[in-house]
Amino acid sequence: MSLRVFWFLFVILIAWTGPVTAAPLRIAYSAISGAMSTLWVAQEGGYFKREGLDTELLYIGGGTLLIQSMLSGDVPFAYGPSVPVINATLRGSDLVLIGNTGNSLVFSIMSRPEIKQPAQLRGKKVGVTRLGGSTDWALDAALKQWGMERSQISVIQTGGMPEGLAGLTAGALDAVVLSPPSNFRAAKAGMHELEDVGQLKIVFPNTPLSTTRSFLRANRDTSLRFMRGFTQGLQRLRTDKEFSMKVLSKYTKVTDSETLAQLYQTYGVRYSGDRIPYVRPESIDEILRRTPGKEAREAKAADFIDNSLLQELDKSGWFKTLGR
């Protein structure tokens, strides 16, 4: 083949295949819950795109799969799980928490209509999404409040909020730990709220952002742009009820205005977190205190936190400009 023919065919091939485009930045979230509202609003409001990022949101239910996705490099950022990230870090992974929008266990213990008192749960089946996850912690907090032992009930893994709600309404579960809007749906179906765990005022990193330290080091600029987009979403959530309710409806499939208003009140007002969504060290201390093993006893909250993105944005005056 002559050199001229070779270059002609090469140019034709390039023109036929078209330009190579970068893969979107994948961001995973761990639940179909209003707790994910900041991320959803940031995406739907176009704030990541405004920062020059092409982003794709992925729902990955359950902390284990989400952790594996981050460690494999498939998903650079995740929103939702805290305990699985801390447990993985205790085992030597380089996962790290870089922000957090919820500092309370925003869950309700919902029971069958005939169960009106916690004592009636003895010997009954109670659902959590994952053993060791935030719903499991919420259940333990409620049991402590009630003066009950875990051994007095049977704890069942459901895998997700929709599955837990379905199990409760079908009678396969006697009670289940649910977050909004699933707890609101349960109440509309005639279920009973045994405990509003959020009212127990337990400091807990309910909806943290996480990544790997290696990604953060290698992609500092991308990480900063991601955090700018995310915090713009948080500001929009807090200040634009109408838009936020539309976004919540899209992702949760809730359509009635009353439930959407409750959902917004919960996550856009009551539990939207601190002005700057730092990870609070005391919230990590709470998890470490309740985690068995020598590694947890010897660990410090700082081992799991990197607030440097938010600190850099704060120092630059970023948060003073939001909302202007």
Question: Model-predicted segments: where are they?
Answer:
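Short, glycine-/small- and polar/acidic-enriched structural segments
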Residues: 23-170, 174-180, 193-197, 202-203
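Conserved C-terminal helix/tail region of periplasmic/extracytoplasmic solute-binding proteins
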Residues: 288-324
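Bacterial N-terminal signal peptides
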Residues: 6-17
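Hydrophobic alpha-helix position signal
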Residues: 42, 48, 88, 143, ...
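Short amphipathic alpha-helical segments at helix boundaries and their inter-helical linkers
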Residues: 75, 79, 169, 267-281, ...
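Positively charged n-region of N-terminal signal peptides that target proteins for export
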Residues: 1-5
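Secondary-structure end/capping motifs
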Residues: 217-297
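Pocket-lining segment of extracytoplasmic ligand-binding domains
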Residues: 83-84, 162-252
